[in-house]
């Protein structure tokens, strides 16, 4: 998990043990923060490999939103760390991936095709209804341990959705499956 400024400039984006977690931001802002410091959001397979050995089907002790990164214990009393030493991959908060997903087919989201102006005057996307541009999330969140794990994915949220249970982590381009 990363800490970052809220201006998408990357000036205070850090990956530090005990850093303040940045959440409640849209996918685009997390991607911009990572790019500002030479990182990218991980790919689906990149996250799966990096998170291997992390806690599976458990979440953070207390099932509460953590304020800081690293050093957490899961509901089974195990340190929440992967075989590669990555902290908080699973059971802390859903983490945005670079990968596109299928749209949410829930009838309440379906609608006509139209252009949606992206926040920050950065262009538009052509999408169907309210959730036609879905990005994958990985790892699981603090409030539902049974859905957490290195291969756990959610394709429910569109990229301009922001809540406390969604965050991001950055990785070097070669480790993200990006050439």
Task: Give the location of each predicted region.
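Residue-level marker of positions within ordered structural domains that often coincide
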Residues: 5, 96, 173-175
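Structural recognition of the beta-strand scaffold that forms the well-ordered cores
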Residues: 40-42, 85-88, 93-96, 136, ...
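Solvent-exposed loop/turn segments at secondary-structure junctions
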Residues: 47-48, 93, 100-102
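Cytochrome P450 core scaffold surrounding the K-helix E-X-X-R motif
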Residues: 98-111
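Short aromatic-cysteine micro-motif
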Residues: 4-88
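Disulfide-stabilized, aromatic/cysteine-rich ligand-recognition loop
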Residues: 18-25, 42, 114, 118-179
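Short, charged, low-hydrophobicity "junction" segments
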Residues: 66-71, 109, 114-117, 121
């Amino acid at each position: 998990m990363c800490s970052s400024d809220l201006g998408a400039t990357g000036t205070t984006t850090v990956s530090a043990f005990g850093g303040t977690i940045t959440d409640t931001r849209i996918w685009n802002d997390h991607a911009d923060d990572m790019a500002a410091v030479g990182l990218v959001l991980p790919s689906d397979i990149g996250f799966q490999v990096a998170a291997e050995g992390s806690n599976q089907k458990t979440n953070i002790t207390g099932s509460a939103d953590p304020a800081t990164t690293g050093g957490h214990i899961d509901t089974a009393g195990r340190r929440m760390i992967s075989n590669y030493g990555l902290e908080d991959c699973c059971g802390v908060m859903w983490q945005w991936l670079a990968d596109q997903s299928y749209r949410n087919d829930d009838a309440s989201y379906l609608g006509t095709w139209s252009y949606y102006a992206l926040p920050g005057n950065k262009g538009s996307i052509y999408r169907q209804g309210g959730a036609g541009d879905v990005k994958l999330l990985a790892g699981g969140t603090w409030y539902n341990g049974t859905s957490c794990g290195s291969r756990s994915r959610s394709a429910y949220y569109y990229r301009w959705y922001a809540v406390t249970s969604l965050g991001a982590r950055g990785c070097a381009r070669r480790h993200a499956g990006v050439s």
